[in-house]
């Protein structure tokens, strides 16, 4: 299978104060989120001038992917589209059609399976092609890459740097975005949480740490709905009660600095740590690192050349899915599960 373009598909984020509320309304459309909750979340964005870091990082990643494709001998145009804010994926796919693109590889900024990590991006692809209509390019979503060796190495280096900056014996804590327990059980089952735990295991092994914690962050929704726990701040409180005063937090659930990273960890978690005399260091995310861009090229090459998936080896490997064409569901154990 040959491609004549690449599409970087992401979540999106506002790039000015006037964009914050419309962006949040797009994100929460149809979910019945009360206006006062949107106002509360909007304040997180206003804290940073109404600008999410994600679009800037993704534009830099587009440039890196383009350079890595050229270095690999596969020069292709790289397009950028989002689910929730400009550039919207529908507009990007229309641009691709107008430029004569016939088949594009789609690399998403989510390494995971499950609904939020995989199926929503599949739905984005189907919606964009339907909006464009006749002449829309074939869009091939690349596989999940939570256990790609390059991703493991990037997180391992970030963890090592964070741990070495702390004094004394530090606790290693991995975080990822929480989701409702029912959603996690519906896919796999528990595909997403197992993938997160497996990546944590791989990164810990690569850094020589056998003892670590996996916790969750950024939950939302009604308090009576159970989500993956413990929350990072609650876990910091538990560590404090055990007398632990140095913590390295590694947000392995995120490939770049989403607002959830810079607000929930760099502000809320750090504020709690400072108030309770805990030294906290947050590990870096891959962002626009050239090795992360090469990971995307690896996934493309697997499809073009028919290579087997490049996956890190570890104890009790967890399945990965995600490959699909034109918004087709990827697997009965991931995307193929019917949503309620």
UniProtKB/Swiss-Prot annotation:
Reaction catalysed by this enzyme: Fe-coproporphyrin III + 2 H(+) = coproporphyrin III + Fe(2+)
UniProt EC number: 4.99.1.9
Keyword presence, Cytoplasm: yes
Positions that bind Fe(2+): 177, 260
One GO cellular component term: cytoplasm
Stored PANTHER family: FERROCHELATASE (PTHR11108), FERROCHELATASE, MITOCHONDRIAL (PTHR11108:SF1)
Family statement: Belongs to the ferrochelatase family.
UniProt-recorded name of the protein: Coproporphyrin III ferrochelatase
Organism whose genome encodes this protein: Mycobacteroides abscessus (strain ATCC 19977 / DSM 44196 / CCUG 20993 / CIP 104536 / JCM 13569 / NCTC 13031 / TMC 1543 / L948)
